[in-house]
Structures are given as structure tokens and as C-alpha cells.
Amino acid sequence: ERQLPAHFLRIELMVALIGGSLPAVLFLANAYTPGAFRFLLYGMVLVVGTLVGLEIPLVMRILKRNVALKDLVSQVLTFDYLGALAVSLAFPLLLVPHLGLIRTGVFFGLLNVAVAAWAVLLFRAELRAWRAHALACAAVFGVLLLAMLGADRLTTWAEDRFYGDRVVLRESSPYQRVVVTAGPAGVRLFLNGNLQFHSRDEYRYHEALVHPAMAAHGAPKQVLVLGGG
């Protein structure tokens, strides 16, 4: 029973390290080992989900010392649901558009490290080796901080490898990741990694849109183009 805080700390740090590095690892895996991407994705999600699932029973067992059992379950699950709601809204609307996928993952990892550090201070008297736990928090924090600082470089490496051709433009808008490549085969436009335009065969797409309208009108002198990007 006295080791419950230590178990909670270990799980929290594993969630921070694995969950925080998950987007970066998947970015690199998709670029360098695409055949193993699905297995790595499902495996890491399964591990993180299992660890997060273990946290709630541990928190309940720790809090039952000070909270009545009739109120404990409702309070823990309420905060769990509220936290999940806040994250599900902040992730697509605020964090990813401003931080990007890699930095967003690292940000949540840093939040887990902060929770672990707070737990070290809170349960310091019950931990057999609180200094070792504090050192582990510092080590995980350092790894995630390096990932945060190197996020742009990791993204560049992964995209250069994934697209093959030279990347001439890469931008993240509030809605999508825009990448333009140029190579011997022509210019390509990708939105969120999906091919949208290729200079080699774009005429097929545009001719199908333009010719029927032009033929129906005859000989237009003024043309209004809507959404012609």
C-alpha cells in the first residue's frame, strides 16, 4: 500500500515519455519504415492506453485515505471526463494549429512530467528513494525538452525522406499542413500528406472543369474564377 505513490510516479513518467514522443516517432517511422508504421502506431497507442487505464485505480486507492468511498469514484471520474473534454477541444482547435503535431505531443508529455514532479513533492515522505524519482522526472523532462527544441528539424527530416523530391515549401496553416515539392517528374502539392496537384497531369483535372463551361457559352470575354487555387 505504501508503494502506490511510487507506482503512480513510474506510470506517469512512462506515459510522459512514450506519449510525448509518440508523434515524433510516428513521423520518422512513416518516412523511414512505412511498412512497420501501422504496427508501431497500434502498439504505442495500446501501451499508452493501458498505462493511462492503470492510473485511475491507483489514484482511487491513494485518495481513499482522505476521501469517503461514496464520493471518491464520482469525483475521480468527473475530473477524468472534464479533463478529456478539455483536451479533445484544445487539441484540434488550439494546440495543433499553433504548436504542430510533434510539439503538441511533447507538450502533453511535459504536463505528465509536471504531475509526476508534483507527486514527488506531495508523497516525498512515503517514497523510499524520492531523490531517484526526482532525478527520473528531470531526465524525462530533459528528453522531452530536446524533442520540443528539435521538432522542426525532425519534421524536416521526416518530410524530406517521405516525399522523395526536394521540398520547396512547407507551411502549417490553422487547417492543414501544406507541402510543395519539385523534382524531375514535376511539381507536386500535398495537403496533410495527401497528393492534391501534380504539374504533369493537372491539365486533365482543369480541362474537365473549364471546357464544358466554355463550350456552353461560346466565346466568353470575361471569366470569373471561384476557388481556382
Briefly describe each language-model feature range.
Residues 1-229:
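Alpha-helical transmembrane segments of multi-pass membrane proteins
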